[in-house]
Amino acid sequence: DVQRRLANGEKIDHVWVMFDKDDFSHFEEAHKKIEKLNNSKTLNVERLHYNTKNNIVWHSCWSNESFELWLCLYFCYYQSASKRTEYINFLQNKGIPYKKNLPNVHDILVEKGGSLETAIKYAKKLEKAKGIDNPSTGMYKFAEYFIGYMEK
């Protein structure tokens, strides 16, 4: 999609790459490659070339083990390495009818007593303690960047 947009003359400032570790064996390598894109002059992503003259900033928003960790952090500091099913059970015990791609998930989490600011704080704390090891998530980077738009 980035290549097509650039070819159409669109200006792209940021590319957000979001992914879970789950059973992805190249998780750490993918994270490093995305972060490294900001430091290289010419990028080769799956044989597609982007030149940094476009001033694109690349962001790696990982979740290790899964995205559902980010949702649990709205409520508490969750520092045990867990699987997706455990995170989903935690959310359901909070009364959240969680399913993948749940619309308005942020609003539902807040209605149930969760806080975006809490999730950001705990995600940063996990990253400081764990790096990208399980459990950790870089979703706070996306949230911090767009929080101003959410408040409008």
Model regions and ranges:
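C-terminal accessory helical subdomains adjacent to catalytic cores in phosphodiester-
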Residues: V2-H14, K21-K152
